[in-house]
Amino acid sequence: MAVEDMDKKYRISDIARELQVSPQEVLRFVKEGGAKVASTSSMVDSEMRGLIFAEFSNEKKMVDETRKIRAEKQLRLTRLEEQSRRAVEKEQILRETLTPSPAPPVHEPPVRAAAQPAPVPVAAGEAPSPLAPETPAPATESAPAVAPAGVPAAEPVSEALSAPLPEPVPEPVPEPPAPEVVAVVEAVPNDQIVSYDAPKNIGGLTVLGTLDMQSEADRKKKGKKKNFREQAVALKDEFETPSSTTLDEDGVPKKKPVAGVQPEGFGVGKKKGKKKKPAVDDKVISANIRTTISGMDDSSGTGSRSKFRKQRKMEREREQEEADLLRESEQQIMRVTEYASPHELAELMGVTAKDIIQKCFALGKFVTINQRLDKESIELIALEFGFEAEFISEVEATAVEAVVDRDEDLETRPPVVTIMGHVDHGKTSLLDYIRNSNVVAGESGGITQHVAAYEVTASNGRKITFLDTPGHEAFTAMRARGAQVTDIVILVVAADDSVMPQTIEAINHAKAAGVPIVVAINKMDKPEANPEKIKTQLSEAGVLVEEWGGESQCQEISAKKGLGIEELMEKVLTEAEMRELKGNFSKDVPATGVIVESELDKGKGVISAVLVQRGYLKVGDPFVAGNIMGKVRALMDERGKRIPSAGPSQPVSVLGFEDLPQAGDVLTVMASDKEARDLAQKRQIIRREHEFRRSTRVKLDSIARQIKEGLMKELSVIIKADTDGSIQALADGLMKIQNEEVKVQIIHQGVGQITETDVLLAAASDAIIIGFRVRPNVNAKKLAEKEDLDVRFYSVIYHVLEDVEKALEGMLSPELHEESLGSLEIRQVFRVPKVGNVGGCHVLEGKILRDAKVRLLRDGVQIYDGMLDTLRRFKDDVKEVDAGYECGVGLKNYDDIKVGDVVEAYRIVEKKRKL
C-alpha cells in the first residue's frame, strides 16, 4: 500500500485549493524545486506534495488565525452592543419608576390608617399585577423564612416612621396582617438607594418589582460592583438635597431601619436587581463632587485672575494630552499607496527591504525588492510590523462626488480593446493592418502621426476603440493607478513559434484585471504554422479556447496578408455584446476620462491622448488629471481633425494641460477653474508628502557619508554588460567585496544595452547602474538624467571592483567625468585605397570635434573606443561638424564599420568629488 501511495499523483490546483493559496505560487515553488511541470493542471507525486505542504502550511495557519481573530473581534463587538443596549433599557425603566415618587406624601396617611383594618384588599390589589407570574415564587419561599422574625415587621414599619430601632419591636406578633406585611416589607429593600420609595406606595412597589426579572448572569455581573454601589450610596447620603430626605415624616431615620431589616434574607434578589442604577448615578455623583470641590477651590482663591490662570493651565494640560495621544496614534498609521513595492514599505516603516521580503516569504509570497504588492499583502505586512495601513493616492483628495448614472442615460458603447503579446509575434503588424484598412478616402499617404488610441469601424458599421500600449508594462501601470480602461484583450501568438514568457505574463495581467481574452493565432500563412501546438500550450498556461471546451474565443489570422482579420473583429464584437458594455451619454454629466499617453509638442505644448469614459468632453471645460489642471483648448481625433466634443469610448487628443500628466491618470471635468486649481494643489501636497518620505538617490560618491550616518546598509547594483561571461565575472567580484557596515547586492543583471526598464528598476530600488562595454539608449539616458541616477561605464573589470571598494571605504579619488559631445550615424561605407574604410555619416545630435574621443556602437553594444583619424566635409578637412550635416569619418586603426553603426563623440573632464 505504501508503494501505491508513493505512486499516487496529485494535481497542483487541488493542492493549492486545499492549502488556500494561489495555484501560481505553488507552481512557482514546484518549478524552483526542479520538477518539470507546465501548468497548475500538472500532476506531482506524494513526495513533492509533502514538500508543498511543508512550505505553505504557515500561510494556511496565517489565514486561519486571521479568520479566528476577526471572528473573536466581531463577537466582542456584539457583546458590547448587547450590554450597552441592556444598560440603556434598565436605565429607562429606573427613570420611569422614579417619576411618580414625589406623590407618596399625599397618600401616605390614608395608607397607614387602612393598613391594619384592610390588609387583604391590598394583597388582592397586588396579585393581578402583570409581574405576578414570577413574583409569587420568591415571595412564598421567603415567607416561611421570615415568619419568626419578619411577621412582627408590621409594627416596625409603623414604628420606623417615629423611631429608627427595629430590633426591640419583633416580640409583639399581630398574626392577621402578617401576609400583607411580607408583601410590604419585601418591596421596601428595593428603595434602599432612593429614599422616595420608602413609603408604602402600592403603585411604586408594584413597578419596582420588575427589577426582579433578571437573568442569573446579570445578577452575578452586577454583584461584582457591590463595593462601588455602597460607596455611591454613602456619597449620595452626604450630598443629598433636603427635599429628597424629607419626603416622609421623619424620613431620615426611616431609611436606616430599612437598611437594617434587608440583610435578614428576604430581599436579596431585589437588592441585586437594583444595582444598575448606582452605576448610572456614580457618574453623576462623581461629577457633582468634582464641581463642588472645584467651586470650593475657586472660592478660596485670591480672585478671578488666579481662577482664570488655573482654568487655562488645566485646559493646556488637557490639550497637550490629547495632542500626545493623537500623535502616538498617527505614528502607527502608515499612509501608503496601493501596489507599493517592498522597498517603499521599508522606507515608510523604518525597516529594511530584506525584512519585508522575509515576511513575504513567511506568508508564502515570493517577491522581489521592486515587485508591486497588492492591497491585502500590504495590510498583512503592516500588521506584522505593528502598523495600520491607510491607502492613499494623490487623487484621494478628490472632492468630486460621483453622480449616479440614470438608466435612461446609459447606452451601448464601443468596446475598448488592447492588443498584447510577444514582440515578435506580429502585434505591430496586426495594429498596422487594422489602422491602414480604415484610412478614409483622400488620405492615401496613410496616417502620418502616431496616436496611442484610435477608433475603427467594422464591416457591420459598429465601432471598436484600440489602445496601442507598449506591452503589458503600460497595461499594468494604468491598472496600478486605478484606471480600468480595457474591456477586451487580444492575445497575439505566432503559429510558427510557441507561447513565450511575455505571453504568459500578458495572460496573468489580463486575468488579474478580470478582462476576457480573445486569442489571435498569427502567421498562419507560413508552412511551419502549428495552431494545435499553440492551443495546447495556452491550455497549460490557463487559457482554454472554445474549440476545446473553454471560454476564450480563438481566431487564426495572418496580419501580413489580412486573412481572418474580419472574423477576429466579429468575435471581439460578440464578446462585447456578451459583456453588455454601457456608457453614460448624458451631456449634463461632468465628463471623465483616462490619460492613455502624453507628449510635449514644440508648437502646441502638452498633447495627451484621452479615452473618454463618461459624459461628453467639450472645448472650454476646466479639468483635473492627477495633480495637473488645465482647460480644454482643442480636441482632435486620431487623424488630427478638430472636433467639438467626444463621448464615451471615444479616443481624442486634448490640448490645454499645464504640465505632462502620467498615463493612467483620471481626467475629471470640474465646475470652474478655481475648483480645478484647488483640487490639483491638494493632490500635489499629498504626492510631495509621499515622495518626501522616500530616501534620496544613492550615489557612489556619497556612500561613505551615508554609511557613517547609518543611512546605508546595502549597495544595490544593476549590471549590464556585452557578454554573459563579463556579467558573471563582475557579479562574483562584487559579491566578494564585504564591509562591516555595508555589502553589495546585485538586484538585476543582463546582456545588452541599458534600457528604460533598467533605469526604472534602479529608481525604484535606489541602485546604481554599471555598464560594462555597453551604453544606454537615448530614452534611457534622458530618463536617468531626469531621475538623477548614478550610471557608470567601464571597460575593465578591475576598475569596477576598485571603484566600488574605494567608494565603500570613502577613498574615492577625483572623478573623471565624461561629457557627451554628439553622435552620428553611418549611412554608407566607402573603401579608400591606402586609407581603409571611411563612413559617410549624418550627425544626429550635438557637435562632432576632430580631436574628440569616440566610441563605435553596434546595436547598443560598444565595438570600438578610440580617436578619429579623419573628419571631412566635401573633401575638406574640418575641425567640427554640427547636427544635421553630413560628413566623412575614419577611425584610427579600425576598419570594421558597417551601415547603421552609431559613433558617439565625448571628452573626459576632471571633476572634484564632494564627500
Curated annotation (Swiss-Prot):
GO terms for cellular component: cytoplasm. Residues 558-560 are annotated as: G5. Residues 522-525 are annotated as: G4. It comes from the Bacteria. It is found in: Cytoplasm. Residues 165-177 have a biased composition (Pro residues). Residues 293-305 have a biased composition (Polar residues). Residues 421-428 are annotated as: G1. Its main location: cytoplasm. CDD domains: IF2_eIF5B, IF2_mtIF2_II, mtIF2_IVc. Residues 83-177, 216-280, 293-328 are annotated as: Disordered. Residues 412-582 form the tr-type G domain. Residues 111-129, 137-164 have a biased composition (Low complexity). GTP binds at residues 421-428, 468-472, 522-525. One of its GO terms (molecular function) is GTP binding. Residues 468-471 are annotated as: G3. Keywords: Cytoplasm, GTP-binding, Initiation factor, Nucleotide-binding, Protein biosynthesis. Residues 83-94, 314-328 have a biased composition (Basic and acidic residues). Residues 446-450 are annotated as: G2. One of the essential components for the initiation of protein synthesis. Protects formylmethionyl-tRNA from spontaneous hydrolysis and promotes its binding to the 30S ribosomal subunits. Also involved in the hydrolysis of GTP during the formation of the 70S ribosomal complex. Belongs to the TRAFAC class translation factor GTPase superfamily. Classic translation factor GTPase family. IF-2 subfamily. This is Translation initiation factor IF-2. It comes from Chlorobium luteolum (strain DSM 273 / BCRC 81028 / 2530). The gene is infB.
